């Protein structure tokens, strides 16, 4: 297991008395904004992402256990980005080979440029009070757009929509257009698995070829889940340096 002591963002979510477990959902007052999606107010909504992609070394995987499920909704979804890559045209595979993508740590949807539901609107503090957590200011990180699994050699599409910034070396308009296309392609239901939780369910996944999302649940409901991060990293990235990447 990867110790939370090694990562500020994980350490801030640690389960009391544990250095290995984090609590990814809570009861009571949320620690992040809630959102209206299709007119329904939902807490706990976390957009599609790859864990620790905001660091140079992407973790091997994670293990998630549902301690107390909510009464309605609260599903978690996964997308197999190796399957996404396999579905690309040969022309697209050739085009994106060698491209690098800049990622940023985001814990809210502020600044997310691609793929958010059209109906999404952030609820105000008056509509859905929350206690904001302190987010560390970390440098952006660069990873390949085509990721290669360190054990199998299989390629996957390195798309983590929550933290995407741009593609290095491309004009902004071209970068935005390509990322918008690739995010829309990735978020097709045919690539998704949506899990309907029961208490004590456990799901493990290979983080090096997946992205996942918490689909939210009604504001005011309780949902508690614990996660352990699996050690064994994919050292595919580096910190972004503006002058070096100009």
Descriptions of predicted regions:
Residues 1-204, 208-246:
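Fe(II)/2-oxoglutarate oxygenase catalytic core
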């Amino acid at each position: 297991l990867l110790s939370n002591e090694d990562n500020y963002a994980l350490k801030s979510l640690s389960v009391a008395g544990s250095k290995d477990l984090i609590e990814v959902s809570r009861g009571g007052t949320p620690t992040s904004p809630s959102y209206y999606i299709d007119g329904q107010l939902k807490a706990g909504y976390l957009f599609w992402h790859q864990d620790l992609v905001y660091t140079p070394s992407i973790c091997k995987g994670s293990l998630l256990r549902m301690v107390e499920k909510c009464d309605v909704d609260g599903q978690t979804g996964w997308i197999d980005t190796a399957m996404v890559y396999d579905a690309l045209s040969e022309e697209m595979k050739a085009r994106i080979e060698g491209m690098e993508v800049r990622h940023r740590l985001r814990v809210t949807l502020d600044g997310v440029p691609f793929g958010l539901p059209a109906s999404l609107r952030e609820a105000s503090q008056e509509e859905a009070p929350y206690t904001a957590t302190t987010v560390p200011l970390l440098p952006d990180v660069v990873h390949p757009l085509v990721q290669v699994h360190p054990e199998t050699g299989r390629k996957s599409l390195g798309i983590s929509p929550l933290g995407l910034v741009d593609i290095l070396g491309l004009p902004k308009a071209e970068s935005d257009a390509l990322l918008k296309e690739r995010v829309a392609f990735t978020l097709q239901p045919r690539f998704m698995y949506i899990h309907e939780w029961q208490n004590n369910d456990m799901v493990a996944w290979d983080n090096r070829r997946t992205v996942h999302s918490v689909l939210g649940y009604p504001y005011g409901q309780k949902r508690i889940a614990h996660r352990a991060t699996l050690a064994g990293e994919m050292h595919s990235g580096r910190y972004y340096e503006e002058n070096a990447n100009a």
